[in-house]
Amino acid sequence: ASTMAGQMLNVIVDNMNNTVRAQVLEGYKEKGGTLTTDQAAKLVTPIVKNVKNMNEVGKNSANGNSPISLFQPLWIASLASAAIIFIAISKMPVSSRKENFLLKVNQIVTGAIATLVIGFGLTWIADGMVGLNISNFTDTALFLSITSFSFFLMISAVLSLVGLKGIGLFALLLFFGAPLLSLASEMLSPFYQDWVYSWLPMKFMIEGLREIFFF
């Protein structure tokens, strides 16, 4: 989006330069005046543009797409952990409501531990091994852990209702949602903004990471 805005501004300034140059030369021509070397040099670019980037993405940020780079492995890890824990829990015998309740609590606690490992592990891999620019390790790791736990709870709830068939739904969300998340919402059509992008559960992760990384 920033690249497109910069290109548009460059075209606008270039058109203004051409218009001003033509008007000034036409005025000199009507008056029969002549131009000095300095005046001619200034007429080449009568309007000088000074570009200053705000909230620059910095180095080693995947050209500003580091939130998207972190989303995909986090989503897949959350989906895999929810599926594995669900399969393990579903095979355990339950004879009473109390045992079923304790089993659900155990599922949530196990998921919380798994998502902590996912959040801190992914941040460590991205920072130490991949080399992404992560200015605040702890905030990023905690945010990813909370996000992963939220994904885990959502996926587990769906799996408890429809079974392992629900995994296909979240795979489709990854397949169709990731391309939309890489675009600025202003670049989407009103339909996608209101009925697709606003309903993507992972958009909150992308927006949160952008706040942590770039603002």
Language-model features and meaning:
Residues 73-78, 103, 107, 111, ...:
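Alpha-helical transmembrane segments of multi-pass membrane proteins, especially transporters
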Residues 31-32, 119, 152:
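A generic alpha-helix surface/boundary motif
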Residues 78-95, 145-161:
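Repeat-unit-sized solenoid/scaffold elements
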Residues 63-71, 98-113, 135, 161:
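Membrane-water interface at loop-to-transmembrane-helix junctions
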Residues 79-120, 124-130:
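Juxtamembrane interface at the cytosolic side of transmembrane helices
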Residues 124, 129-215:
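Membrane-spanning alpha-helical segments of multipass transporters and channels
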Residues 41, 49, 53-57, 96-104, ...:
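Juxtamembrane loop-helix boundary motifs flanking transmembrane segments in multi-pass membrane proteins
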Residues 1-84:
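Transport-system extracytoplasmic interface segments
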